[in-house]
């Protein structure tokens, strides 16, 4: 589930992006951030 967030979530140019954050939360993580245009989940 978490891996699909990285693939599916579009990341903007800077910082947080809602889609990534939401996806990570659904995957059971605390939050999601964008790092180098990729979604990363924070446990």
UniProtKB/Swiss-Prot annotation:
Signal sequence extent: none
Function: Reversibly blocks Kv11/ERG potassium channels. Is less toxic than ergtoxin (AC Q86QT3).
Protein family according to the UniProt entry: Belongs to the ergtoxin family. Gamma-KTx 4 subfamily.
Any GO CC annotation of this UniProt entry: extracellular region
Domain notes: The presence of a 'disulfide through disulfide knot' structurally defines this protein as a knottin. Has the CSalpha/beta fold, which comprises one or two short alpha helices connected to anti-parallel beta-sheets stabilized by three or four disulfide bonds.
Subcellular location: Secreted
Natural source organism: Centruroides sculpturatus (Arizona bark scorpion)
Disulfide bonding pattern of the chain: 5-23, 11-34, 20-39, 24-41
Molecular function as annotated in GO: potassium channel inhibitor activity; toxin activity
Tissue: Expressed by the venom gland.
Presence of keyword Disulfide bond: yes
Keyword Repeat among record annotations: no
Identification of the protein by name: Potassium channel toxin gamma-KTx 4.12
Major site of localization recorded for this protein: secreted
Keywords per UniProt: Disulfide bond, Ion channel impairing toxin, Knottin, Neurotoxin, Potassium channel impairing toxin, Secreted, Toxin, Voltage-gated potassium channel impairing toxin
InterPro entries cross-referenced by the UniProt entry: Ergtoxin, Scorpion_toxin-like_sf
Domain of life: Eukaryota
